[in-house]
Amino acid sequence: MQDSLKLLRRHWEELSRRCVFPEQRSQAVFQLLLQAYAEPQRHYHTLQHIAECLALYSQIQHLLDDAPSLALALWFHDAVYDPQAPDNEERSAALMMQACAGLLSDAQLRKVSAWIAATKLHLCADESDLQYLL
């Protein structure tokens, strides 16, 4: 798990540099995500799942129009997980909006939020980047 955590940290730091996140805020958001994905009720939606998603992302990021937005959507798409709740995706999108407020443009916040919400139904998407997420 330690190697996986190092890999996750490296991915996050690279994304933070690309998005020009201030160091202190970047670390706070990263810690928020680590805590969320380590919650005890999780069995599939864990840090291992995010590591697997990011491994696939690394293989296709050169094909994306907006790689940073897709990476953020991957990081946050299961950040809120209550097995009994019907609105995990919406709550994950809201968490991203709150955590990244002031770090991203309003347009990018809306895009990433919409992409996270789209993971609820996994319907076909018109946007090519979103197709990779789904």
Task: Give the positions of each predicted feature.
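Active-site metal-coordination segments of metallo-dependent hydrolases
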Residues: 41-49, 81-91, 106
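Conserved N-terminal diphosphate/IPP-binding helix and adjacent helical/loop segment
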Residues: 1-50
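An amphipathic alpha-helix signature
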Residues: 9, 13, 27-30, 54, ...
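His-Asp-centered metal-binding catalytic motifs of divalent-metal-dependent phosphohydrolases/nucleases
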Residues: 53, 68-83, 92, 114-120
